[in-house]
Structure formats: C-alpha cells, structure tokens
C-alpha cells in the first residue's frame, strides 16, 4: 500500500489480521483529579494563637479504589492530619483527594500496582499542596508533608501478604482483612 514518498507506509486494515484500527496496547493514565471530600477544623480558635507549645502532628493516610466501569477506576488518597498540644487541638484536616484513572489492556498485577502504588504517588503532591494551603489559611505555618514512597510501601505490603499466606498453608488460615 505504500507509495513512493508517502508518509503512510503500512496500513493493514484487514480485521482478520488484527488490524481493525482498535488500540490494543497496554495503557494507564489519569483522566482527572479532584478534591472529593475535605474537612478543616480550627476547634480552639482564637485562643490557640496564644499557645506557645510546639504541636505534635499525627498523620494518617490510606488508599482506596472503586471501579467506575471496566476501564475506569477512582483512586482515593485519604489523608488525616491533627496538630495537637497538651492544651488541645490546633487543627484537624481530613482530605480525600481522588483521581479517575483509565486502565486498558494491562494484566491484573500491573493494573493493581498502578492503582495502589503509582496513582497515589502521582496524586500525593497535589494533596500535599491542598494540606499546606489549608494550614496556611487556618493561620498557621504551612504544613509540608514529607514525601511518601508509595511504591516501596506497596512492595512491602505484597511481601507481608505473601508471608502471611505462607504461614497459613501450614495450619489454620488467618482471618482476612476487615
């Protein structure tokens, strides 16, 4: 089909040969990202601004995923931050930062790793900025969360799960995650 000097050199559009024009390459990427839920509390204002004690920061995070359809998954990065002293809480921030990811033609293991390791890694800097802006808007120094190694945590969790399954083969099966 290629003519001399033609940019298109080989277009095999024969459906029997698999050239039906459909994109069968493995792909994963973000469609959009957004704040799904956010709560910001400043429970002891205005007195909190007179406190001299340095606060202790309690940071909790979790990753969730919900299938929207066969090719789209919503990934949620849940971050809870509480700054407190012996006098009480300075602020409490609860954030669910989410993204819609499209996944096509990936194996289950690759798709799982993208959803629970790579997608949170990509979402985190944006969620970190939301937290920093919220603490600044509360009247405190912006809280800059340290980077999180989501890929390392993912691999660690897989190793833990494999070890738990190996222990379960020799005796009673351990209870599943609640």
UniProtKB/Swiss-Prot annotation:
Mind listing the GO molecular function terms for this protein? unfolded protein binding
Compartment(s): Cytoplasm
Example of a GO cellular component annotation carried by this entry: cytoplasm
Q: Does the keyword Ligase apply?
A: no
Q: Cite the residue spans of the region called Disordered.
A: 1-25
One Pfam short name = SecB
Gene3D superfamilies, A to Z:
SecB-like
The organism's superkingdom is given as: Bacteria
| Alphabetized UniProt keyword annotations | Chaperone, Cytoplasm, Protein transport, Translocation, Transport
Residue ranges annotated as compositionally biased, kind Acidic residues, are 1-13
Chief location of this protein? cytoplasm
The record's function comment reads:
One of the proteins required for the normal export of preproteins out of the cell cytoplasm. It is a molecular chaperone that binds to a subset of precursor proteins, maintaining them in a translocation-competent state. It also specifically binds to its receptor SecA.
Family of this protein? Belongs to the SecB family.
What is the designated name of this protein?
Protein-export protein SecB
What gene is it encoded by? secB
């Amino acid at each position: 089909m290629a003519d001399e000097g033609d940019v298109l050199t080989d277009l095999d559009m024969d459906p029997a040969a698999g050239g039906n024009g459909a994109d069968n390459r493995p792909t994963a990427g973000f469609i959009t990202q957004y704040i799904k839920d956010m709560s910001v509390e400043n429970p002891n204002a205005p007195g909190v601004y007179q406190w001299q004690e340095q606060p202790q920061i309690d940071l909790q995070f979790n990753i969730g995923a919900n299938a929207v359809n066969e090719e789209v998954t919503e990934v949620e990065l849940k971050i809870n931050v509480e700054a407190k002293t012996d006098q009480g809480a300075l602020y409490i921030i609860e954030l669910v930062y989410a993204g819609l990811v499209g996944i096509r033609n990936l194996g289950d293991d690759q798709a799982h790793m993208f959803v629970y390791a790579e997608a949170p890694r990509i979402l985190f800097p944006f969620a970190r900025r939301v937290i920093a802006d919220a603490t600044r808007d509360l009247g405190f120094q912006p809280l800059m969360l340290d980077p999180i190694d989501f890929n390392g945590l993912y691999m660690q969790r897989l190793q833990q799960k494999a070890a738990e399954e190996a222990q379960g083969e020799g005796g009673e099966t351990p209870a599943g995650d609640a």
